[in-house]
């Protein structure tokens, strides 16, 4: 009987020890899988632990990183967008389209935040160096909010990300709630030295116009295309929009002067209702060509002010 009791006792001890080891292994497994997510490129990314050395390859993400309480050890150089004060002294690794890989690798990052369309060519090299990469896209308003959510998950500050997204929604609603119910017919033209294209819902200006409830007369031509597509003068005359928005690199005053010359030299322009009424607006590149990020509500208000100046008079 004593032997049976002793054997039973030993069995209990062994079982407890095994259970203890099993729990420990489970904890390690959980600890080794800090975060799993799908990034903007549709890649499944798993972080074994919370990243400590994050590098951003685009200045567009800096304000969003700051908003969720994140820190970085390296960043792309910003020529136009504002850099948060706390990040100005952070080492730079080159312009967004000309990243210095030697400088980047020298920072020994454990996570790189890359642009979906700008930096996908770097992903294989970074991953071969055991560096995690999350590709982000923040052209549309929904993409900005998704990026904020991802960054909140990366830094473990989901509550801050949620609050920031709620604030963005409120700021946009504060503008759209003041607008008349009518649907303005608009077109968004992107002008370069070689061509003029029209922009759709996946461009910044196109997304903003959608948020404001405007009707893009070029929507049919853009169906199934990317954010821009060529558009003929004949089609523009036929659609005859109420308002024309123009995006272009350069100073708005210079662009407006160039447009006046074009209008003068091409009678077809002068047949357009928008041109006759003086409703051609050049949109600032810092809000409509360069990703506005958390300034998206500012872009929404800017476009709304051009269309309905009386609604937003006296700084409303």
What positions do the PLM features span?
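A short, structured surface patch at a secondary-structure boundary
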Residues: 53-107, 111-116, 214-217
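Alpha-helical, coiled-coil/dimerization segments enriched in small aliphatic residues
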Residues: 79-81, 198-227
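Flexible loop/hinge segments that line or gate small-molecule binding clefts
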Residues: 83-86, 118-150, 154, 281
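Structured C-terminal subdomain patch of bacterial secreted/periplasmic proteins
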Residues: 145-146, 153, 162, 176, ...
